[in-house]
């Protein structure tokens, strides 16, 4: 049985990238809802409908677990999904808690970057309210980064220009940690680093989600003996065009490059 991964677009590849590291012998289905991306700028009701359509499709593929590799979809629908399906469902949320713990010690601020919909969600506000006792957290929606990623446009000059414009009213020196609260954003780690400096920490929930997936499968005695294959679907349509598949797999190379540059520091 395979593991299903779902995202509004290609952002979930950043989570799949981490999952393959800890679970190399599983087989995966990656479902990108490219017909309806971006989710972060749409109504909650519409997005929930898209999410359930994707989950129904993945359930029909006889998966053993589902990873909602999208912060927006997790915040909107994970509880409802768990009530409706009998396989384990693992989500991803902005990694605010470790960021606050670290920045409290260092007397620095935390910047959470995400989509509009994630930042508006009550679930996110409750999470921040519960743990941000020193008013350290600032938030910024960066929908343009989702568009860059979905267009496979990783031109650093364009991205830095966009980020500089969006961050023009922020004092960048006051931040100790950037929380990448959208799964599309780890593709742009190097651009964030060029603006904030190499000392700033960048945290996403991807690693924790991958570890949680492994734990859930181990607890259920469902760890696989597969080959690490990935089958790609765009909004329910299987991708057979090798050129498109190569574009998807090239995303792993981009993530390799961002990780190498961070190891270098």
Curated annotation (Swiss-Prot):
GO terms for molecular function: amino-acid racemase activity; glutamate racemase activity. InterPro entries: Asp/Glu/hydantoin_racemase, Asp/Glu_race, Asp/Glu_racemase_AS_1, Glu_race. PROSITE patterns: ASP_GLU_RACEMASE_1 (PS00923). The keyword GTP-binding does not apply. It catalyses: L-glutamate = D-glutamate. The keyword Cell wall biogenesis/degradation applies. Coiled coil: none annotated. It comes from the Bacteria. Pathway: Cell wall biogenesis; peptidoglycan biosynthesis. The active site is at 70 (proton donor/acceptor), 182 (proton donor/acceptor). Substrate binds at residues 7-8, 39-40, 71-72, 183-184. Keywords: Cell shape, Cell wall biogenesis/degradation, Isomerase, Peptidoglycan synthesis. Its EC number is 5.1.1.3. GO terms for biological process: cell wall organization; peptidoglycan biosynthetic process; regulation of cell shape. Transmembrane segments: none annotated. Belongs to the aspartate/glutamate racemases family. Provides the (R)-glutamate required for cell wall biosynthesis. This is Glutamate racemase 2. The lineage of its organism: Bacteria, Bacillati, Bacillota, Bacilli, Bacillales. The gene is yrpC.
